[in-house]
Amino acid sequence: RLFGCSFLPHHDYGRGGRGWRDLWQDCLSLLLMEPGDVGRMIEKNFGGVRIDGTTATIIGAGDGNFIADRNGIARVWMDHALWPQMTTKLYIDQTGDVEILNRQAPYFKDAQAVRGTQIDAEYQPEQGGWQRTSQGEVYTGTILEHLLIEQLAAFYEVGEHNICRLRGADWNDALDMAAERGESVAFTCAYAGNLRELA
């Protein structure tokens, strides 16, 4: 941490609140304790995936409600695409409900674009939080489509060593200098494993 944190290298902190990982990890635990409504929750959770494979990071009240990033700061966490697939696979293994992959879900939309590197200047909050077609209708895709977009976009976002970029590294709040050149061998292997499972 001494070389990865620009401020107080011996200090860890948390921001609180319920985020993307919490959402999917809650589903994982509910699969073991109260599996009845987990399929419906999983379907709604996929509405937090953007069309570029990134995800909403703030969870609103109730299932399927997502909020743009705090303070208007574009954030992309490189591990976010792992959780939906891990959870959905366990759900299918536990229930046999393979048809969940064919169910439709919308895509989240806010001003963040191009995997958090640009702002969509044409987006207006009045448009709502869903990706729309050129005709103004909410675009939906299968859950399988959501999974493929997430996995492929994350897998191909690599750094100078052809390893997945670390991006924000927010699961370790002591690293705030990883966004430029940080890479993760562990998550590269995890995404490769997810792609093998999808194949």
Predicted feature residues:
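Structured secondary-structure scaffolds
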Residues: 1-8, 12-21, 27-32, 38, ...
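Acidic/polar, glycine-enriched structural segments that form the non-catalytic walls/loops
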Residues: 1-15, 118-126, 130, 199
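Acidic/His metal-coordination segments adjacent to aromatic residues that form catalytic metal sites
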Residues: 2-9, 57-75, 166-183
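Aromatic-acidic/polar surface patches that form glycan- and anion
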Residues: 16-19, 77, 180, 184-187
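Residue-level signal for cytosolic alpha-helical hairpin/rod architecture
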Residues: 23-24, 195
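Aromatic-rich carbohydrate-recognition surfaces in CAZymes
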Residues: 30-34, 38, 42-160, 185-192
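C-terminal ends of transmembrane alpha-helices
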Residues: 156-170
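Conserved, charged catalytic cores of large soluble enzymes
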Residues: 167-171, 190-199
